[in-house]
């Protein structure tokens, strides 16, 4: 126990104090730890029941066109039980039937306290953001949902309790909610997978030192066969500070922390960028083109890290019930029409094919300091290099005389040929080089 606590403190320190010097040594020519099958690795967040059936059927059709199968469904307890034992489930029932018809692998999470169950003091605002007075009531409602919707095999307990838990975050209390709910679900439905709440960012807290996921590990998370989840949002695909490459540093440290302490599955259950046009709310304004660019670069990076599954936020834009920023995260607009990010992702998945195997990168000359590259082998034997560099220099590949360079943002496909090795002009956006070894 003492050794584990020392390990936890040392990894937490690495997460907190990733310096420019340390980050500059981080490898940016990456090799994934295992093959990736997009249909199993990449999912999307959805809120089908908050849309008209004709719209969410179109959303599902668009998702099917991408060849993806995993969805993460939001369920707000105050919405489905506005009064004690008075349930409003008709919209959710219909959405769940559509999910069943499409054979989606589904992760559902319930968040927020119903009015009758909230621990909020009288007159408090944001009553749903207070934890329930009785954790067993929350657990019983999740069991009831899991029994009502047997097509859902994965259940997640709350959402972002490191920032959405009034009056302040409480790691011990969330740990009790998780344990109470997991025990109730396993007693009733032992085959279901239990997932921790997706922690905002890397699970750091507003006013409590440390990381909530670390607190759960101290409480035995690694022995409970529970999936760990967090939401690595950042300003840029490479992190909040591009020179520090802090996404790679922090995600690797957190994944290593979790895996080395007994957690077998680590899921990023939200990540992405909004295309909103203001007013500015934490994320800077990047528009629809920036959203497409950032999403592809982050997807390339995440595919090469030790995540077992990731869920992009979000399949669709949201209506005025969400904040201005949160309205714009979708692959699709409110009418289920593709945004540029959807088209770019579809191009990306078409280029890569359904399954990739990690391989060694090709030999190159004069690698720039800001290069990011991930090497893969496609099912047809072709090799792919996902690559970008803000400096926009050129790379020469001495052993490759014929190749194709794909730009998934534009859909362009340009042949390259040279007798002494091709030269590729790098861009700050993702390109994919394809060649036959």
Language model features with spans:
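Carbohydrate-binding surface patches
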Residues: 364-401, 408-411
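Bacterial N-terminal signal peptides
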Residues: 10-21
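C-terminal beta-strand-rich structural cap/linker in extracellular carbohydrate-active enzymes
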Residues: 417-437
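Aromatic/acidic polysaccharide-binding cleft in carbohydrate-active enzymes
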Residues: 273-345, 361-363
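Short, acidic/polar
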Residues: 50-64, 137-145, 207-218, 292-299
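Noncatalytic carbohydrate-binding groove/subsite architecture in carbohydrate-active enzymes
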Residues: 171-295, 305
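Boundary/entry segment of secreted carbohydrate-active catalytic domains
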Residues: 27-63, 68-69, 74
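Aromatic-lined substrate-binding rim segments of carbohydrate-active enzymes
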Residues: 57-65, 70-126, 137-144, 148, ...
